[in-house]
Amino acid sequence: MKHTLKFILIGLFCCLCNFTVQAQTRNRQYEEYIHKYKDLAIDEMKRYRIPASITLAQGLLESGAGKSTLARKSNNHFGIKCGGDWTGRTVRHDDDARNECFRAYKHPRDSYE
């Protein structure tokens, strides 16, 4: 019985350590994203009066801290779809439906505007 309890406690400790390491990695990715794009968000806040914190939070969520396929390959940090009047570059990506049309930007700055 003592050995079983010992193994259970060791297993729980290992799981907790793994969870902590993953959370630290995620926090570091979030901090890097915020540091990298905060100036863009502040510029847009001045233009449109949307708080930079809200813009950054949405960008973090939609782009997976800049790690999503859309963010990496098309600089689309907000999951913005093409829409009927979009005439710029596009990329196809599976989202709510297969092969949906998303806007592709030359620079992340364009996604923030």
Predicted regions and their residues:
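Bacterial N-terminal signal peptides
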Residues: 8-18
